[in-house]
């Protein structure tokens, strides 16, 4: 409904504007058709650079004289026009162009108004070369006859060069002039008027601060009033009031400032129902009218400029308007035109003129850093008298400086802290200083009169009677030769103006020196005095605090070219009062180390809602936010019915319903206890009918379930557990008994809380009564901080475009391992043909986070660079970016802010028309791969999880791949999250491959063996000493089994359903430890083998003592395990069948203390226990042998028995605790390190083999790692625009031309194919009967004449060799005829 109404407002505005103001099609080029006399300039450089050559696309261009101190180009449009755009070019084929300029306009050549762009910036950007046309479409259309362009900067390699185009249309002006005692009224044609929509529009200009512009009213309290108060425009409107309506209808809105500047200001009011717009000079203020009515009921007339007749008594305190009003439009009726025509429905009060009679004071604009105006005076007079008028916003500035004659000293008038300070310094005497006035920097005109003569001085401000300041002091006055207004020139020694005051910035007029009015026209043309950096006949003051760029009710204070914001008592901070001062929840205070108490929170951050005070119940694991209200005590209700129910509104302390709703919406859990007691009063009545009583929650939604129940069902708590008094009912109170019953419980559905009203409707019977009781709202948690989403390649989320007006702040956390990607981007409509506004935050490189934007000043970016670490380290990083009219800044984590101040008068309007992309740039370019969470834009959290779509590559949360992997990591591989996929870390396994599923083995020839040193003798001694002190072995705790705690761990060869007993959890590697990690209280051994020979030793672990471990094949081909722990050996027969069948076999042995777990192939897991006489430790492991034992020292005879001739076959997947010798041998890059080369030795031929094992699954290549990957619906992105259309037409034209040429070539070359033409005469028919031809004469044979045929010409027979006959000698010879047979 809201969007429909706003659309209707815009539609009404367009229709009314098109008919009443001529906007439609107002785009004519106005300079080209003008005569040469309409183009003028301050000067010209040469004969072919005069103003007449300044037309757009002309053969030359205008250039002023070198040294012209105030160059300008002026256009006389011959009549008033509406102007909508201006375009510039440089001088043709030259290095002369203007880079910045000012646009002035007016109705006469001696009074100019600067055009201010949005942001109160009077400077337009110009050209960068001599040929390109730079066009500026103005944000509002103004009316003028004269246009003046003032160049401010130009190409430093050339000079000023300009060609100009102005776009608009003719404008019909109907002007009414009021002198303060005049007024007119317009009577409706059909008496009273009633309307759903209205449009009021007009233009005005004045020098007064107060005045009534328009007024109309009705008998039912309806009225519309537009007036000036303090040079601000005020709109008062009401759609009526009624005693039965609870809300008053009066609404007042304000716009603009310093509107008494004698410039035309355009006003427009659009209303549709209660939705309304107030437009002033292009700035639109949208608002909603108070009250409940939607139609405007007016009596029979509208008053313009004041009140007429008896209506004056209604607004007797209002001043009539003094100034000019133009084209007053009411609902497509031009009242001003009717007044000019003296229509019968127009009533006049006083002498209303039909042309402007405003004075022309010729002001001077002081806007430069070293501006001044110097005028001569009458020297050596005994009385110094100066007067002038000024207006400014600045607190300080030099108003006047004059050096006294005869070296007596000087006189200074300066503005300081809003008052005029006078300083008279004389040689040999104490300086005289005094002040006058108060708050003279208010932007209005103030008149200063200063007189100094012998022994006394006097100054008066604004000719206020009795307010002048008189000072008696011994003075000797002799006037000097020069008076400096607005500042001192540089260097001061040359001009004799020595003042340490800053230059004055503002406007001055009516300068008088020694009682004589200064002729400023002579000053402008250098015929009197001197000046620098000033503009004549214009005043460029503007109200930079209207509209107010200080947010959250911050106070705006302005100077000549800037403004500042004071944010005290607002709850916000920053240059525009945008940044929240308080934390968003009690949970944030808990995390910062606070204790329970009252705190101020701001749930929506920098959003529009105000902060408020709550009680924070801070506990160890959570913080409860408690919001109290005015219904904490029992409320009794009687006499209510369903027709006239009781409305129990809940007013929360220190907060509105919207602010409390924002708290609940941001919380993880909320609850509110509600209790309803009844005496002969019903609650719900039936489960399907409309209830007697209910409660209203967030967004004014009605809810029919009560405490302890669930949303969507019309029940109380007893209705869920079937414990109501009457089992057939769903609430205790529905029993309707003459005794007190109660339904109570907690309301816990967050999206419905808080409770805002309780409606009770069944207490109108005799002796019936109801009571309700509501406890405070209690919430905890923060569901916005962990609103997380994961992105895969090419995925992105689309949200509605940013609507941020003048400020935008973005904050979010990201986590990624990708080197680059765009976090978010929003593009807007084009500024011009080649540029579009945008805002983008991205990870540009692994060490750079960039905030890039274009708000109209070109591409700009801020970069946070990291030297100490990379941002793609798979850790969470906080990004905060902010942009407003004062500055742009960026911060990552706790690094310092990267800040860039905006140029003065920068305007930002961050309302885009394209979708906001999260996770990529527009059209899914430069996608981000990783996780984002807690993304906020101006305090509003984007629901990332709610937009997650697995089919498009986005998933909620930042984990999940390793929790439920598609293929697990085998053999103890560690699962590593990679956002759009996962990888398996196989470093601690004896396998490789994507899922640690590829066997790494070696084929052992007879006599081949491998040794891997587990530790040196020195480390063994250290280990023994550590064991004696009962300290944990470096790297692992007792009972460690590698991979046991790894997500996705699948024990190799343990078979289905295998689970290790609950022994102590493994330890973690010690940082900095680099040697092989061992464990004396347990081992885990796994490997595969295949062989056809026996006996052999497959694996042997030796020690520096007599302990060892061995797995061997006996003579009969069976597999045996031998342990030597302590003094006595332990022998276990692993298989009873031979394993020398040439097939792969797997072995997995795990020992934990005296418990031994064994699995061979896929046979069931067996468990063995060592005797208590056997030690539980494998002391001082020394080396690991594969294929054959080549250990020195004493070796068990049984091992020696099976050690010769050695193993012949294949071993793979060998792992002893964390040692994988075959993987180390085959996968370590060459050359090896010296330490590793010393630890590992191979004797004989050992070649890599997987021993015939097949991988468990076919590995897949993730999209990010596949260079040839394309998504299923890979789009083609292009941004060629209209260039692509032109290229398409050009290619089509060339193809058509080529086809046409081929067709013509074909027709030309095959036109006569198969035929020939001759010049033979037609055959002569004889007169013989039957039409037979005569016989040929005797002699040489002749070819018969061809017989005519309609479709074929027969080929003649070849002539004989003797040549043609006599009759054929005159015929043309044909090539075929000349050939012989």
Curated annotation (Swiss-Prot):
Cysteine-cysteine disulfides: 26-169, 324-356, 507-539, 545-556, 550-565, 567-577, 931-958, 962-975, 969-984, 986-996, 1210-1251
The subunit field of the Swiss-Prot or TrEMBL record says:
Interacts with CNTN1/contactin in cis form.
UniProt main location, coarse: membrane
The chain positions of domain EGF-like read 544-576, 962-996
| Keywords associated with the record | Cell adhesion, Cell junction, Disulfide bond, EGF-like domain, Glycoprotein, Membrane, Phosphoprotein, Repeat, SH3-binding, Signal, Transmembrane, Transmembrane helix
Cytoplasmic compartment segments:
1306-1381
Instruction: PTM Phosphoserine: list the residues.
Output: 1380
Q: Which Gene3D superfamilies match?
A: 2.60.120.1000, 2.60.120.200, Galactose-binding domain-like (2.60.120.260), Laminin (2.10.25.10)
Signal peptide range: 1-20
Regions of biased composition (Basic and acidic residues) lie at: 1319-1329
What range(s) does the F5/8 type C domain occupy? Answer: 26-169
Q: Tell me the protein's name.
A: Contactin-associated protein 1
Q: Where is this motif: SH3-binding?
A: 1329-1366
Family according to the record:
Belongs to the neurexin family.
Give the bilayer topology: Single-pass type I membrane protein
- Matches recorded under SUPFAM superfamilies: Concanavalin A-like lectins/glucanases, EGF/Laminin, Fibrinogen C-terminal domain-like, Galactose-binding domain-like
Q: Where is this region: Disordered?
A: 1317-1381
Q: Which SMART domains does the annotation name?
A: 4.1m, FA58C, LamG
Q: Which organism is it from?
A: Rattus norvegicus
| Extracellular-facing ranges | 21-1284
All copies of domain Laminin G-like, residue ranges: 204-356, 390-539, 814-958, 1089-1251
Can you give the residue ranges of the Fibrinogen C-terminal domain? 577-796
A GO biological process held by the record: postsynaptic density organization
Q: Where are the transmembrane segments?
A: 1285-1305
Composition-biased stretches (Pro residues): 1334-1363
């Amino acid at each position: 409904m809201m969007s429909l109404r706003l659309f209707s407002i815009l539609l009404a505005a367009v229709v009314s504007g098109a008919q009443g103001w001529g906007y439609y099609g107002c785009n004519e080029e106005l300079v080209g058709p003008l005569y040469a006399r309409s183009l003028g300039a301050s000067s010209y450089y040469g004969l072919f650079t005069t103003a007449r050559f300044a037309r757009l696309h002309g053969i030359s261009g205008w250039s002023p004289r070198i040294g012209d101190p105030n160059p300008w180009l002026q256009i006389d449009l011959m009549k008033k026009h509406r102007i909508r755009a201006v375009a510039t070019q440089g001088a043709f084929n030259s290095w002369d162009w203007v880079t910045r300029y000012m646009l002035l306009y007016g109705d006469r050549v001696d009074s100019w108004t600067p055009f201010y762009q949005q942001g109160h910036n009077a400077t337009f950007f110009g050209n960068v070369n001599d040929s390109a046309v730079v066009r500026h479409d103005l944000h509002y259309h103004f009316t003028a006859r004269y246009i003046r362009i003032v160049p401010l900067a130009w190409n430093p390699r050339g000079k000023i060069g300009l060609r100009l185009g102005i776009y608009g249309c003719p404008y019909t002006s109907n002007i009414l002039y009021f002198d303060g005692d005049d007024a007119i009224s317009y009577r409706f044609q059909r008496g009273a008027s009633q309307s759903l929509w209205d449009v009021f529009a007009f233009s005005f200009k004045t020098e007064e601060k107060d005045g009534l512009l328009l007024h109309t009213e009705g008998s039912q309290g309806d009225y519309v009033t537009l007036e000036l108060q303090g040079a601000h425009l005020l709109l008062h409107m009401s759609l009526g009031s009624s005693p039965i309506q609870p809300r008053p209808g009066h609404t007042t809105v304000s716009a603009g400032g310093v509107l008494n500047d004698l410039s035309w200001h355009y006003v427009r009011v659009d209303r549709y129902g209660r939705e309304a717009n107030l437009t002033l000079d292009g700035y639109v203020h949208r608002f909603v009218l108070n009250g409940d009515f939607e139609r405007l009921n007016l009596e029979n007339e509208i008053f313009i400029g004041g009140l007429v007749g008896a209506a004056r008594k209604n607004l007797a305190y209002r001043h009539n308007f003094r100034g000019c009003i133009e084209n007053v439009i009411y609902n497509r009726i031009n009242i001003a035109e009717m007044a000019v025509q003296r229509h019968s429905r127009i009533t006049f009060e006083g002498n209303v003129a039909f042309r402007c009679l405003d004075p022309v004071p010729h002001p001077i604009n002081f806007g430069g850093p070293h501006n001044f105006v110097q005028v001569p005076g009458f020297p050596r007079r005994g009385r110094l008298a100066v007067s002038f008028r000024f207006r400014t916003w600045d607190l300080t500035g030099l108003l006047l400086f004059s050096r006294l004659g005869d070296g007596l000293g000087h006189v200074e008038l300066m503005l300081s802290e809003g008052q005029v300070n006078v300083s008279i310094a004389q040689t040999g005497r104490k300086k005289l200083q005094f002040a006058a006035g108060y708050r003279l920097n208010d932007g209005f005109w103030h008149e200063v009169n200063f007189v100094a003569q012998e022994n006394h001085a006097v100054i008066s401000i604004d000719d206020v009677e009795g307010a002048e300041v008189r000072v008696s002091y011994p003075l000797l006055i002799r006037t000097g030769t020069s008076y400096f207004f607005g500042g001192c020139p540089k260097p001061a020694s040359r001009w004799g103006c020595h003042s340490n005051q800053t230059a004055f910035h503002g406007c001055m007029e009516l300068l008088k020196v020694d009682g004589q009015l200064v002729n400023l026209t002579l000053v402008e043309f250098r015929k009197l005095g001197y000046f620098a950096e000033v503009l004549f006949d214009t005043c460029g003051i503007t109200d930079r605090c209207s509209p107010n760029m200080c947010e959250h009710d911050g106070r705006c204070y302005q100077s000549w070219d800037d403004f500042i914001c004071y944010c005290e008592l607002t709850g916000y901070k920053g240059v525009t009062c945008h940044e929240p001062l308080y934390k968003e929840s009690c949970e944030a205070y808990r995390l910062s180390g606070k204790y329970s108490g009252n705190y101020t929170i701001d749930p929506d951050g920098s959003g529009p809602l105000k902060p408020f005070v709550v009680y924070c119940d801070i506990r160890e694991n959570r913080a409860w936010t408690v919001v109290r209200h005015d219904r904490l005590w029992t409320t009794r209700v009687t006499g209510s019915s369903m027709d006239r129910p009781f409305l129990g509104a809940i007013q929360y302390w220190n907060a509105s319903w919207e602010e409390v709703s924002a708290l609940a919406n941001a919380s993880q859990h909320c609850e509110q206890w509600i209790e309803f007691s009844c005496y002969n009063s019903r609650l719900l009545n039936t489960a399907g009918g409309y209830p007697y009583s209910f409660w209203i929650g967030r967004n004014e939604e009605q809810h029919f379930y009560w405490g302890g129940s669930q949303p969507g069902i019309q029940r109380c708590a007893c209705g869920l557990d079937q414990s109501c008094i009457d089992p057939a009912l769903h609430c205790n109170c529905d029993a309707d008994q003459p005794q007190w019953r109660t339904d109570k419980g907690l309301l816990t559905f967050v999206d419905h809380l808080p409770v805002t009203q309780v409606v009770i409707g069944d207490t109108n019977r005799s002796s019936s009564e109801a009571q309700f009781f509501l406890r405070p709202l209690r919430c905890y948690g923060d569901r916005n901080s962990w609103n997380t989403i994961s992105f895969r390649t090419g995925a992105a989320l689309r949200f509605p475009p940013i609507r941020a007006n003048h400020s935008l702040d973005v904050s979010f956390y990201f986590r990624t391992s990708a080197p680059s990607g765009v976090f978010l981007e929003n593009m807007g409509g084009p500024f011009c043909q080649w540029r579009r506004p945008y805002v983008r935050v991205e990870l540009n490189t692994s060490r750079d986070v960039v905030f890039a934007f274009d708000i109209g000043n070109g591409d700009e970016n801020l970069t946070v660079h990291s030297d100490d670490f990379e941002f793609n380290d798979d850790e969470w990083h906080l990004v905060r970016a902010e942009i407003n009219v004062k500055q742009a800044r960026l911060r990552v984590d706790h690094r310092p802010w990267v800040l860039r101040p905006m140029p003065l008068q920068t305007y930002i309007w961050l309302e885009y028309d394209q979708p906001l992309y999260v996770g990529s740039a527009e059209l899914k370019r430069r996608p981000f791969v990783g996780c984002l969470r807690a993304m906020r834009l101006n305090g509003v959290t984007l629901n990332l999880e709610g937009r997650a779509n697995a089919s498009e590559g986005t998933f909620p949360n930042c984990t999940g791949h390793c929790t439920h992997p598609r293929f697990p990591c085998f053999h103890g591989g560690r699962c590593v999250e990679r956002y759009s996929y996962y990888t398996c870390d196989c470093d601690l396994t004896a396998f490789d491959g994507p899922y640690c599923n590829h066997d790494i083995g070696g084929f052992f020839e007879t006599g081949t063996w491998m040794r891997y040193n587990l530790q040196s003798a020195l480390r063994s001694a250290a280990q023994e000493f550590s064991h004696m002190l009962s300290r944990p072995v470096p790297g692992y705790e007792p009972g460690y089994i590698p991979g046991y705690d790894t997500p996705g761990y699948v024990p190799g060869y343990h078979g289905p359903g295998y689970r290790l007993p609950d022994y102590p959890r493994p330890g973690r590697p010690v940082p900095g430890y680099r040697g092989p990690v061992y464990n004396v209280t347990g081992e885990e051994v796994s490997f595969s083998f295949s062989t056809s020979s026996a006996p052999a030793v497959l694996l042997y672990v030796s020690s520096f003592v007599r302990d060892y471990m061995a797995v061997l094949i006996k003579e009969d081909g069976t597999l045996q395990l031998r342990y030597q722990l302590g003094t006595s050996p332990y022998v276990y027969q692993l298989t009873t069948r031979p394993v020398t069948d040439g097939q792969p076999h797997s072995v997995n042995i795990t020992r934990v203390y005296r418990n031994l777990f064994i699995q061979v192939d896929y046979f069931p897991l067996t468990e063995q226990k060592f005797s208590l006489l056997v030690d539980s430790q494998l002391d001082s492991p020394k080396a690991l042998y594969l294929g054959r034992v080549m250990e020195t020292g004493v070796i068990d005879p049984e091992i020696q028995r099976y050690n010769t001739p050695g193993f012949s076959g294949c071993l793979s997947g060998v792992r002893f605790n964390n040692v994988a010798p075959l993987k180390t041998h085959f996968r370590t890059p060459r050359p090896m390190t010296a330490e590793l080369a010393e630890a590992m030795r191979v004797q004989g031929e050992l070649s890599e083999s997987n021993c015939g094992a097949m991988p468990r699954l076919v590995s897949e290549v993730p999209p990010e790692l596949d260079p040839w990957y394309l998504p299923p619906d890979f789009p083609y992105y292009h941004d060629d625009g209209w260039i692509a259309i032109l290229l398409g037409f050009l290619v089509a034209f060339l193809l058509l031309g080529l086809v046409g040429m081929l067709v013509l070539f074909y027709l030309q070359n095959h036109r006569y194919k198969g035929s020939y033409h001759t010049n033979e005469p037609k055959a002569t028919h004889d007169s013989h009967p039957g039409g037979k031809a005569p016989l040929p004469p005797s002699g040489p044979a002749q070819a018969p004449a061809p017989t005519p045929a309609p479709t074929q010409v027969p080929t003649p027979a070849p002539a004989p060799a003797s040549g043609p006959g006599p009759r054929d000698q005159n015929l043309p010879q044909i090539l075929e005829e000349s050939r012989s047979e």
